[in-house]
Amino acid sequence: MAGEKVEKPDTKEKKPEAKKVDAGGKVKKGNLKAKKPKKGKPHCSRNPVLVRGIGRYSRSAMYSRKAMYKRKYSAAKSKVEKKKKEKVLATVTKPVGGDKNGGTRVVKLRKMPRYYPTEDVPRKLLSHGKKPFSQHVRKLRASITPGTILIILTGRHRGKRVVFLKQLASGLLLVTGPLVLNRVPLRRTHQKFVIATSTKIDISNVKIPKHLTDAYFKKKKLRKPRHQEGEIFDTEKEKYEITEQRKIDQKAVDSQILPKIKAIPQLQGYLRSVFALTNGIYPHKLVF
């Protein structure tokens, strides 16, 4: 009809509303959109930066500017019950005889020392984890085994080749020349100052005397009696003399090792020779 407006049907389909379920099982209509928490307006830092890493206000000033003192913090309570320690009594009341003595007397359980040192000497405290030298673990390089030929790098016998016998209690190595070949007697040396070579001899059957210990090789200091006549003018020094026991022990060890050295060709000459570096020879490129 003329003059009448025709209503157009809605082509857009309406989305079905989401249903909400109560705890009782009833369905409620409503939107599924969760309520967002309200956020404050973003703002710049309250501590403007003067230079990179340095702010205008100090830490204490920012504490008051942010009103940090208004915040309340509560520490988490531990569920473990603390055991109450029993207090150790410092004094004990003891009965005392006599009419005029008061009947009782308070006595200290921990008495003070009767005598005190005249000088204040600090006590040497052993720190945690540290042990004295006698209790240190003695380690030996994997390349050094009994019978290994070693090159001594320091001392009067430097450059000479010796035979390693065993490791002593102090960690030092017991070596011998033998004395007949290179004039190196039974002596101690540190494993830091030797080069272990790949040349080895079998000394499993060699019997080393048990008394060859650190005390055996320790130098003995000569004690002179004090106030001896003419001691001011005595200029002669007593020379070290080899004891007969040392000579016997040297022969006992060398007599067992020498036959094993002679059994290997060219080993006698190898032990007699002295190790040295010449021009163009670099120690880090050598294979020992």
Swiss-Prot record:
Q: Which domain of life is it from?
A: Eukaryota
Q: Which residues carry this modification: N6-acetyllysine?
A: K239
Region feature (Disordered): 1-48
Gene3D superfamilies named among the record's database cross-references: 2.30.30.30
* UniProt GO molecular function: cadherin binding; DNA binding; RNA binding; structural constituent of ribosome
BP GO terms, sorted: cytoplasmic translation; regulation of DNA-templated transcription; translation
Pfam families cross-referenced by the UniProt entry: Ribosomal_L6e (PF01159), Ribosomal_L6e_N (PF03868)
Q: Give the Basic residues compositional bias ranges.
A: 26-44
What is this protein identified as? Large ribosomal subunit protein eL6
Tell me the gene name.
RPL6
